[in-house]
Amino acid sequence: MNATFRCFAARKQLKHALLAASILLAAWYSLPPAFAQAYPTKPIRVIVNSAPGGLTDVIGRLVAIRMGQSLGQQLVIDNRTGVGGLLGAEQLTKAEPDGYTIGVVASAITVTPQMMAKPSFDAARDFTPVSLLMSTPLMLVTGLNSPYRSVADYVAAAKASPGKITFASGGTGTMTHLLAEQLQLQAGLKLIHVPYKGGAPALNDVLAGHVPVYFDTLTTSAKLVQENKLRGLAIVSPNRSPALPAVPTLAEAGYPGVQGMAWFAIIAPANTPREIVAKLNEEANKALSTPEIKERILALGGTVEGGSAAVLGDLIRSEMPRWAKLIRDANITIQ
């Protein structure tokens, strides 16, 4: 083999080697980020838009601990309260969509921004749904010293004294508020809204007799009704609760159009890679399937949800226009 041919052959081999290397490199860079390196490689921050001890916080911690054990990285809870629970959600919209900042939120994220003149986020546009966690119906409750023993009693009193009968809520735009607004519209009432900074003070004032009624989550009020510390007037659910079989549904009380539930979910910033979302969804569903979490949610009066990220996305998109209509009809605003 002469020198010229050897040089040509060497150049050809080099060319083939470079081509093969470039193909391998291109294949590597074309891999989704979730597979370019193992996820997660560091702790995950979990923004919870409620105070410690609240229901959003409780369910968030339960699931986060189990997910962290399975993933091999800690999920660190970061409680961000304020602005009706909007502060935490707002911070999540500004986080990097890399899977290392996620959020645990309640259903109010589909409601509260729509009451604002300049909403800071759109729940359907600015977040990536990950997994629904749990849901719970609400129940219209009153104190034991209250004169109301049924929904009919309360409605009759409100009609007899328009603009004088009150109802409590855990804050403007919360489900505890929206259900009362639905009842007010459908029963043709004129009530006075007494908003509180959270469900606990609202419930305390109902127990003390300072405010007559309140739509509370079953997770909080069921035990109080069972212990005869609170009176349940009606449950907002298609069926009666097995835990409180004597309490009728609001439909049975004559108001089938009053509908709504509280739900809790994991979301991530918009544009979070789908492979990371799939991993988080898988881990959330694994956590929800464990006996201890199932039992705890059932003990709280809730329903274990789970399912695909698409299920949560569909729920968010369906809830927003429904609540937007109620907000317009009831002329609900928030500063």
Language model segments and positions:
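Extracytoplasmic/secreted proteins, especially bacterial periplasmic and envelope-associated proteins
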Residues: 58, 62, 66, 87, ...
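N-terminal secretory signal peptides that target proteins for export/translocation
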Residues: 1-12
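C-terminal segment of classical bacterial N-terminal signal peptides
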Residues: 19, 24-34
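C-terminal lobe and pocket-closing loops
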Residues: 135, 221-289, 318-321
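N-terminal (or domain-start) structured segment
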Residues: 35-125, 164-166, 172, 188-213, ...
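An extracytoplasmic/periplasmic, membrane-proximal ligand-sensing/linker region
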Residues: 41-43, 185, 226, 249, ...
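Hinge/capping helix and adjacent helix->loop/strand transition within the periplasmic-binding protein
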Residues: 94-100, 114-201, 250, 263-296
